[in-house]
Amino acid sequence: MNKNELVSAVAERAGL
């Protein structure tokens, strides 16, 4: 998993 995937996953969890 790269950083972009991690950021995307966190953003989805945050409701962004």
UniProtKB/Swiss-Prot annotation:
<comment type="similarity">
    <text>Belongs to the bacterial histone-like protein family.</text>
</comment>
<dbReference type="GO" id="GO:0030261">
    <property type="term" value="P:chromosome condensation"/>
</dbReference>
<keyword id="KW-0238">DNA-binding</keyword>
<keyword id="KW-0226">DNA condensation</keyword>
<dbReference type="GO" id="GO:0003677">
    <property type="term" value="F:DNA binding"/>
</dbReference>
<protein>
    <recommendedName>
        <fullName>DNA-binding protein H3-RL</fullName>
    </recommendedName>
</protein>
<comment type="function">
    <text>Histone-like DNA-binding protein which is capable of wrapping DNA to stabilize it, and thus to prevent its denaturation under extreme environmental conditions.</text>
</comment>
